[in-house]
């Protein structure tokens, strides 16, 4: 009788452990999904919505399936077979996932005309994650069936199972974000949690003396893959990348050409920073932004919110000697890359942290540049009237704010229109300059009525051999005053992800229509030639 009691207690303890590690794996896979998709589709709130919605659908289906399966057959063997299958599928994601994403995106590109990123991320998420999360969704209802011995204590048992699953989910939320992804990357994070599921299954099958060899082989192979020296590349079609890495916040890619060093945080679109190896101007928006120090009454203190790799900071030191530059960058790995590959001068004070939080505690500046981006959009908290009011309050008399807007669109109610109207509601004197040959728009704002006249006079006074002579007249001729309007962003209401996605959708739709036209004329094989 005593032995039987110990056996029941041991069995129940193992079921509780299953609830804990399964809950942990659910959240780890969800966070891994966001990191797997982010380099291709961004990590915006829209993509997160797709991921969470897909996973909730899968879990709901799994809950129904698991409950019915447990009622039909109360033997836990089927549950642990499902967990073993989940382990195999999860372990395959790092190797097959990028090709599935490319395949789904390529297929949808042939006929999806609008909201391509939404549909492509949704299709990829369904293809990769519905099945394993549906299997994990069967765990809780199955365990409730197996662990409940009588109606007298079923409430307590269910509560304990739910609590352990939730505690596991909490750990599975923090562990990938702060430990495994920064330490070993997304690919090995999937393998770590696949190995956990495989070991749990193996433990069960050892006690039952069933499926021992198969589960042992699977557990050993997955564990071996964790330590195997394989090279995982999100941009698998790219050769010769200088750096491909991940941080808590970003996918990071550094590549070099004969003339420049380039940082990207997305494999599909956008370049975050460019450094010209020969020094000098880049021909990009950083050059246009140099009009801000010329416009300011003084240029002694410069603050950059969104330092990136420090191209603008380096240019400020080069073309405006004597100024002190502070840059705030939330991603410490980008700061490290800026020192190692982009030649960020030691004179630049690089602060790791959130731009708005730093601004609140900082002093006064002559120039403040706002160039903070989360993938394709400005973070909502750095696009509102409250934020720009705070910037204004940290500018010295005669100071200038310059904002880089990376998505140019002429459509009514576009992202840039919202930003222009919002800034114009805070600063009385604003103007924009379109960057030639790119999609960027630079906005200059000041409370000094003499600011733009000062810029004109200083451009006229530039020496003929001054490097800025080649770019500043171009900026001057491109300046257009901002009148302002009723599209205002606030801390409470700032739909920047939707606005940014709308502009990106316009760009992608144009590119895809060109692609479809090529296929109609020359056939699909023309893309491979």
Task: Describe the role of every protein-language-model region.
Residues 280, 382-383:
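Alpha-helix N-cap and loop-to-helix initiation/capping positions
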Residues 1-244, 256-258, 267-271, 294-303, ...:
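Alpha-helical transmembrane segments of multi-pass membrane proteins
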Residues 327:
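Short beta-strand "acidic-cap" motif of Rossmann-like dinucleotide-binding folds
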Residues 315-316:
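Surface-exposed interaction patches
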Residues 211-285, 292-295, 431-529:
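Soluble small-group transferase modules, centered on the S-adenosyl donor enzyme superfamily
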């Amino acid at each position: 009788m005593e032995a039987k009691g110990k056996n029941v207690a041991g069995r129940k303890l193992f079921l509780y452990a299953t609830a804990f590690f399964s809950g942990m794996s659910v959240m780890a896979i969800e966070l891994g999904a966001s990191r797997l998709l982010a380099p291709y589709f961004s990590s915006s709130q829209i993509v997160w919505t797709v991921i969470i919605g897909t996973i909730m659908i899968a879990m709901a289906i799994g809950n129904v399936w698991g409950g019915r399966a447990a009622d039909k057959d109360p033997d836990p063997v089927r549950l642990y077979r499902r967990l073993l299958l989940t382990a195999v599928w999860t372990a395959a994601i790092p190797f097959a996932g990028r090709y599935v994403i490319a395949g789904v995106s390529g297929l949808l590109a042939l006929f999806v005309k609008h909201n391509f990123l939404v549909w492509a991320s949704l299709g990829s998420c369904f293809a990769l994650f519905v099945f394993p999360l549906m299997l994990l969704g069967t765990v809780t209802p199955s365990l409730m069936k197996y662990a409940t011995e009588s109606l007298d204590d079923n409430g307590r048992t269910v509560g304990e199972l739910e609590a352990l699953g939730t505690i596991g989910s909490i750990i599975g939320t923090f562990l990938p974000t702060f430990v495994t992804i920064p330490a070993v990357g997304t690919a090995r994070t999937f393998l770590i949690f696949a190995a956990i599921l495989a070991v749990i299954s193996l433990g069960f099958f050892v006690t039952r003396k069933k499926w021992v060899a198969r589960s042992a082989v699977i557990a050993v192979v997955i564990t071996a893959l964790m330590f195997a020296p394989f090279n995982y590349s999100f941009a698998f079609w790219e050769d010769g990348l200088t750096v491909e890495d991940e941080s808590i916040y970003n996918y990071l890619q550094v590549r070099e050409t004969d003339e420049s060093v380039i940082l990207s945080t997305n494999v599909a679109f956008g370049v975050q920073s460019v450094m010209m190896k020969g020094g000098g101007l880049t021909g990009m928006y950083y050059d246009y932004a140099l009009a801000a120090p010329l416009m300011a009454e003084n240029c002694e203190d410069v603050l950059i919110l969104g330092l990136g790799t420090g191209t603008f900071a380096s240019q400020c030191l080069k073309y405006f000697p004597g100024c002190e530059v502070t840059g705030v960058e939330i991603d410490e790995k980008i700061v490290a890359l800026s020192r190692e590959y982009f030649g960020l001068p030691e004179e630049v004070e690089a602060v790791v942290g959130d731009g708005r939080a730093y601004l609140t505690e900082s002093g006064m500046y002559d120039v403040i540049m706002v160039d903070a981006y989360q993938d394709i959009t400005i973070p909502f908290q750095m696009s509102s009237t409250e934020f720009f009011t705070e910037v204004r309050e940290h500018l010295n008399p005669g100071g200038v704010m310059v904002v880089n807007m990376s998505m140019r669109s002429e459509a009514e109610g576009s992202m840039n229109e919202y930003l222009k109207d919002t800034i114009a509601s805070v600063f009385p004197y604003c103007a924009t300059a379109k960057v030639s040959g790119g999609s960027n728009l630079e906005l200059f704002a000041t409370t000094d009525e003499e600011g733009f006249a000062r810029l004109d006079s200083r451009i006229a006074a530039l020496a003929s051999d001054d490097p800025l002579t080649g770019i500043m007249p171009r900026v001057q001729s491109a300046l257009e005053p901002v009148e302002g309007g009723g599209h205002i962003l606030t801390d409470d209401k700032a739909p920047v992800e939707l606005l940014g996605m709308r502009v990106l959708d316009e760009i992608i739709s144009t590119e895809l229509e060109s692609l479809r036209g090529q296929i109609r004329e020359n056939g699909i094989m023309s893309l491979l030639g």
